Swiss-Prot record:
Belongs to the sugar phosphate cyclases superfamily. Dehydroquinate synthase family. The lineage of its organism: Bacteria, Pseudomonadati, Pseudomonadota, Gammaproteobacteria, Moraxellales. Keywords: Amino-acid biosynthesis, Aromatic amino acid biosynthesis, Cobalt, Cytoplasm, Lyase, Metal-binding, NAD, Nucleotide-binding, Zinc. GO terms for cellular component: cytoplasm. Disulfide bonds: none annotated. GO terms for biological process: amino acid biosynthetic process; aromatic amino acid family biosynthetic process; chorismate biosynthetic process. Binds 1 divalent metal cation per subunit. Can use either Co(2+) or Zn(2+). It comes from Acinetobacter baumannii (strain AYE). This is 3-dehydroquinate synthase.
Length: 360
């Protein structure tokens, strides 16, 4: 097992990364009250809920559960309310802990619920997908979608502890594994060319679910995110670099309808668009773009999206949270392994990059 700490000034919390982690031993120091609400979904709960429930009950905790439907399209205010209903019906108080057992949607919703319930209760993350292990479970961003935009309602809510268990990735569908690899590739492209070389050497093993390679990929990804979050917890500056591919990707997700494409699939094509625009701006070479596309394809991810009318695409991009004073800011590549956030780009070139990476 490897342990990584996220340092946040006065606070810090551990991320435990390994296979067949023992929840009783690892969670005990981080569950402060007697009451624990496990939030999961209909896919994950039959696989792992009893394991965590029994571990917590053996510690003398009162455990209640809230099982939600599975999918991005349920990340909304109606389903958030179901968590509040469960907490209130169980009679839970301000010392309770909300434990997220699932992927990014469950983590986002359970975390947001924990931030709101009685103005904030304890939160624990047990991410069961690769995407949530390397991205959404680290750094405290929580929230839900609104019909007019993704993640428009939310809060920063740091967990007490994160348990990333590689054994849980064995039950992950191929598509979900690939979606997680998109975020792993993102860390390499935005800040670590050595990691990109490592991914190029080991991608076949990652796709084949080699537990040791996955643990290394999760550790290196989380270490990158932890460093950035430590410097910029509330996304005032550097943390926005973690959105490489996301402004384009969110537009794809929003147009196609949440859940049609997985978040990681949309981010993968978004990173291709960002690389394409970076090349058009003269920052990276054609070879760099080809290298970006190749590693994304080797992870079984899309490098182009269906045709989306340009006005619609740009409309969704305008809703992005990185818009400042009416100006769209994009995360682009100065070179592979070095991203920048910038508003200095030619909109016509951006349109070309979008259109060049759509298929009929």
């Amino acid at each position: 097992m490897q342990t990584l700490h996220v340092e946040l000034g006065e606070r810090r919390y551990p991320i435990f990364i390994g296979s067949q982690l023992d929840p009783k031993q690892l969670l005990e120091p981080y569950i402060h009250g007697q009451q624990v609400m496990i939030v999961s979904n209909v896919t994950v709960a039959p696989l792992y809920l009893s394991h965590y429930q029994e571990a917590l009950e053996s510690l003398g905790k009162t455990v209640a559960t809230c099982i939600l439907p599975d999918g991005e399209k349920y990340k909304d205010i109606q389903h958030l309310n179901l968590i509040f209903d469960a907490l209130l019906e169980a009679g839970f108080n301000r010392d309770c802990t909300v434990l997220a057992l699932g992927g990014g949607v469950i983590g986002d919703m359970a975390g947001f619920a924990s931030a709101c319930f009685q103005r904030g209760v304890y939160f624990v993350q047990v991410p069961t997908t690769l995407l949530s292990q390397v991205d959404s479970s680290v750094g405290g961003k929580t929230g839900i979608n609104h019909p007019l935009g993704k993640n428009m309602l939310g809060a920063f809510q740091q967990p007490q502890v994160v348990l990333a268990d590689m054994a849980q990735l064995n039950t992950l569908p191929e598509r979900e594994l690939s979606a997680g690899l998109a975020e792993v590739i993102k860390y390499a492209l935005l800040g670590d060319e050595d990691f990109l070389v490592w991914l190029e050497e080991n991608m076949d093993g990652l796709v084949a679910r080699d537990a040791d390679l996955l643990a290394e990929a999760v550790y290196r990804s989380c270490a990158h995110k932890a460093r950035i979050v430590a410097n910029d917890e509330k996304e005032q500056g550097e943390r926005a670099l973690l959105n490489l591919g996301h402004t384009f990707g969110h537009a794809i997700e929003s147009y196609l309808g949440y859940g049609t494409w997985l978040h990681g699939e949309a981010v993968a094509t978004g990173m291709v668009m960002a690389a394409d625009l970076s090349q058009r701006l003269g920052w990276i070479s054609n070879e760099d773009v080809a290298r970006t596309k190749k590693i994304i394809q080797r992870a079984n991810l899309p490098i182009s999206c269906p045709q989306i009318p340009l006005d619609d695409f740009l409309g969704y991009m305008a809703h992005d949270k990185k818009v400042l004073n009416g100006q769209l800011r994009l995360v682009l590549l100065k070179q592979l392994g070095q991203a920048v956030i910038t508003k200095d780009f030619d909109v016509e070139l951006m349109k070309q990059a979008i259109l060049a990476n759509q298929h009929g």
